[in-house]
Amino acid sequence: MRCSPKRSLTAVIAASFLLLLLLLLLHRGSWQDPQEVQFRDLPSDAVLKILKQGSLHILQDTDNLCALHNISYHLLAGSPLPHKKFLAVGLSSVRRPRGYYLPDTLQSLFKQSSEEELQEMVVVVHLADADPIWNAQVAADISHRFAHHILLGRLVLIHTPHEFYPTLEGLKRNYNDPEERVKFRSKQNVDYAFLFTFAANLSSYYLMIEDDVWSAKSFFTAIRKAVASQEGSNWATLEFSKLGYIGKLYRSSDLPRLARFLLLFYQEMPCDWLLTHFRLLLTQKDVIRFKPSLFQHMGLYSSFQGTVNRLEDDEFQADAMDLPDNPPAALFTNMVVFENYEPSKAYSTARGYFWGKNPAVGSIFSIVFHQPARVTRVRVQTGSSERPGDFLHAGVLELGRGRRADGRDCSVYTTVGTFEKGNLEWRGLEKGMPNPVECVRIRVTQSQSEWLIIQSIGIWTAGT
C-alpha cells in the first residue's frame, strides 16, 4: 500500500518531531546527567540505545502510519451507530493456548451496567488472531450469546486483515526478550493501534481493558463522575485499575495519535511501557488513578504461551456505587509525614496513601468538615501488602462537635469504634449521633515501633 507524497512527508515530519520530543524529555537538563531521565520505567541507556538504533527505522516505518488512513476492517458482527456515545470500551482478543474468557468479560460489562448506562456505551472487540477460522468461530459464538446487544449497536466485533500489519519477522530483541515474546508484544501493539483507530469516532471517551476481566457494578457511572472531577485539567490518561493496561481511559480525540505512536514504536517495547511514555509526552507527569479499582483480572492463563498468571488487584471493589461521599474537609495530623505521603492521599479517591512516622499514644489524624454533616458510616483501612507491619495496631474512631476557632479540631469527641487488625467499619452511626458532626478523628491508643499507613478513609453521609 502506498501513500501520497504529501501524506508521506507529513508522516516523516511528525515522526521527526516525536523523536525530538523524546530526546528532550530524556535529557532536558544535561547530556551528562542520567538522573534527569523522565522515563522512570525504562533505564536511560536502554532508551538511548533504542532511539539511536531506531532512528533509521522510524523514517522507514512511516509507511506503516499511512496504513492507519486506509484500513479496510472486516465487520464480523454488529455495526456502529451513527451518533457518538459517551464511552467506548475496547478490547483485543487472540486465541489463548489455555482458557477462553471473552464471553465472561462481555457478560460482566453488560450485566454490571444499567439500561441507561448501556445507552451511552459501545463495546468494540478486535478479534486479532492470525487464524481466520478461530476468529469466525468466536464471532459466531459471541453473536449467539449477545445477539440483543449486537442488534442494539452496543457490541461490535471487528478484524484487521493481515496485509495491513507491518512485518513481525526479524524484529529487534530489545531487553534480550526471546524472539517469540518480541513478536507477540509487537503484534499486540499493532492490534491496539488498529483498534484505537477504529474506535476514535465512536465516543467522547475510550476505555481500554483486556479480554479477561471482571467489571464493578455501575463502573460507567463511576467513570463519568471521575471525568467530571477532572474538568478543566489537561489529563492524558485516567486509570481505574492497578494492573497493566486494564482500565485506562483516554479522550477519544487522542486516539489517532496514540495509534500512530504505538505503530511507530511497535517493535521497541511492551504496550504498557509505550502507554506510560505517551502520557509523559502529553505532559501528564503524575499517574491519576482512582480508588477503588473498577476492574479485576480474572484469567488464570495468559494469552502468551498459556503461562499461569495470577495477577489480582487488591483495590478492586465489586460495587462501584458503594462509594463514600467524603465531604469537603481539611485534614490534620500531629504525626511526622514521610516524604510526600500527605494526609489528603488517604481521604482522596486518587492514587496514594498517608504514611506517618512513629505513631505514639495520643497521635491523631483529624478530618474537619467545611460544613457539618450527618455521618452514617465510616470505613478506614490501614497497612499495605508491601509494608504489612505498618498498620494501626491499636486505635479508636471518634466523632466530634464544636469546631474550634482555628478550624483544626473539635472541642468534644465521642468514641464510636475500635480498630481490629488495622481496619474499621461502622454503620448506622446516625443512630447514636443523630445531629450533624464537624470532625472525624483517628486516635492512636498504643505506641508502636512500625510507622502507620492509612490506605483509605471512606465517610458516608445521610441524604447523599
UniProtKB/Swiss-Prot annotation:
InterPro entries: Glyco_transf_54 (IPR006759), MGAT4_A/B/C_C (IPR056576). The keyword S-adenosyl-L-methionine does not apply. The chain crosses the membrane at residues 11-31. GO terms for cellular component: Golgi membrane. One of its GO terms (molecular function) is metal ion binding. Glycans are attached at N70, N201. Pathway: Protein modification; protein glycosylation. Its EC number is 2.4.1.201. The keyword Transferase applies. Highly expressed in oviduct, spleen, lung and colon. GO terms for biological process: protein N-linked glycosylation. This is Alpha-1,6-mannosyl-glycoprotein 4-beta-N-acetylglucosaminyltransferase. It is found in: Golgi apparatus membrane. It catalyses: N(4)-{beta-D-GlcNAc-(1->2)-[beta-D-GlcNAc-(1->4)]-alpha-D-Man-(1->3)-[beta-D-GlcNAc-(1->2)-[beta-D-GlcNAc-(1->6)]-alpha-D-Man-(1->6)]-beta-D-Man-(1->4)-beta-D-GlcNAc-(1->4)-beta-D-GlcNAc}-L-asparaginyl-[protein] + UDP-N-acetyl-alpha-D-glucosamine = N(4)-{beta-D-GlcNAc-(1->2)-[beta-D-GlcNAc-(1->4)]-alpha-D-Man-(1->3)-[beta-D-GlcNAc-(1->2)-[beta-D-GlcNAc-(1->4)]-[beta-D-GlcNAc-(1->6)]-alpha-D-Man-(1->6)]-beta-D-Man-(1->4)-beta-D-GlcNAc-(1->4)-beta-D-GlcNAc}-L-asparaginyl-[protein] + UDP + H(+). It is a single-pass type II membrane protein. Belongs to the glycosyltransferase 54 family. It is an enzyme of class 2 (transferase). Its cofactor is a divalent metal cation. Glycosyltransferase that catalyzes the transfer of GlcNAc to the Manalpha1-6 arm to form GlcNAcBeta1-4Manalpha1-6 linkage (also named 'GnT-VI' activity). May also participate in the transfer of N-acetylglucosamine (GlcNAc) to the core mannose residues of N-linked glycans by catalyzing the formation of the GlcNAcbeta1-4 branch on the GlcNAcbeta1-2Manalpha1-3 arm of the core structure of N-linked glycans. Residues 32-464 are lumenal. Pfam families: MGAT4_cons, MGAT4A_C. Its main location: Golgi. Residues 1-10 are cytoplasmic. The lineage of its organism: Eukaryota, Metazoa, Chordata, Craniata, Vertebrata.
